[in-house]
Amino acid sequence: GSSGLIPMPRV
């Protein structure tokens, strides 16, 4: 996912 302010899982 993304390692930013908001971690978003890869879907």
Swiss-Prot record:
<keyword id="KW-0527">Neuropeptide</keyword>
<comment type="similarity">
    <text>Belongs to the periviscerokinin family.</text>
</comment>
<protein>
    <recommendedName>
        <fullName>Periviscerokinin-2</fullName>
    </recommendedName>
</protein>
<dbReference type="GO" id="GO:0005576">
    <property type="term" value="C:extracellular region"/>
</dbReference>
<dbReference type="Pfam" id="PF08259">
    <property type="entry name" value="Periviscerokin"/>
</dbReference>
<feature type="modified residue" description="Valine amide">
    <location>
        <position position="11"/>
    </location>
</feature>
<keyword id="KW-0027">Amidation</keyword>
<comment type="function">
    <text>Mediates visceral muscle contractile activity (myotropic activity).</text>
</comment>
<dbReference type="GO" id="GO:0007218">
    <property type="term" value="P:neuropeptide signaling pathway"/>
</dbReference>
<keyword id="KW-0964">Secreted</keyword>
<dbReference type="InterPro" id="IPR013231">
    <property type="entry name" value="Periviscerokinin"/>
</dbReference>
